[in-house]
Amino acid sequence: MKNLQLSRRDFLKISASGTLAFVLAEMGFDRALAAPPASQGRVTWSGIPLYDAPSFQANQLHLFGIDKVVSLKAEVQGDEGYGNPFNKTWYEVDGGYVFSGDFQPVETNYQKPIYDIPAGGRLGEISVPMSLTHLGPYTYAKNGHRLYYGSTHWIMKVVITRDEKSIWYEIFDDELKKSFYVPSYNMRLIPTEELTMLSPEVPAADKLIHVDLATQMVTAFEGQKMVLSTRCSSGQRGTDTPKGEFTTFHKWPSRHMTNQGDAVQNV
């Protein structure tokens, strides 16, 4: 990447002029944003096709079911997805190609149990593609909902079921007002240092997040300094991001991104 920097003022001027995409490409941000995929991908919808080329016009070889996990071999460019000009990324998998927009990049990282859970709970993160919750701390207990890779949940205590030699984390869902149990090997306890405030020395009034709907880019500033620029997906019609100026006054881990209490697709 070229060692260039934009000030907050320059960035807003360029964004308003409609040349942001060109400038970011010149600065090398287009290449920087093309991070390599994870080693695995989880199918997010049922009936996702496998093609013999990275094109929706190519031959369909297979249909994947929801939550199927496949190994990702490479990232390639192909047809834009479903009329979205911002995403032309496809994944090469065994036997063909799949469109990236239908897959969640995931890893499978099993964890050792940690028994030290404070009275107020501790935040944990799902470290496998998908984990079923249970209504009790038993392998054969009735299943609850599914939790997906990268989602975070409050662990309230550790439960050891001696007769089946299993270890569980009890999590509490503040939307459903209910406790569930997750195998301890499927959750990573998040260290305190990962939850500390970013740049606490910078006043809140000097922090700005700029969402550019035209280029689908999110850029963060601390005063006049640009500290992050990354792609975003601002939503399609009906769930799109509204225009305007907004103040974020409350952010909290493990909050449902819905007002309907739907914990099924809790990503």
Predicted regions and their residues:
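SH3/SH3-like (including bacterial SH3b) beta-barrel domains
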Residues: P54-I66, Y138-Y149
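Short, solvent-exposed loop/turn elements at domain surfaces
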Residues: L50-D52, G81-Y82, G101-D102, L135, ...
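SH3/SH3-like beta-barrel superfamily modules
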Residues: F64-P105, Y148-Y185
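Short, solvent-exposed interaction modules
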Residues: P113-V158, S199
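Boundary regions of SH3-family modules and the immediately adjacent low-complexity/disordered segments
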Residues: L20, G28, T89-E125, F172-A204
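Gly/Pro-biased beta-strand-loop elements
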Residues: S184-V267
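C-terminal segment of N-terminal export signals and the immediately downstream linker at the start
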Residues: E26-F56, V69
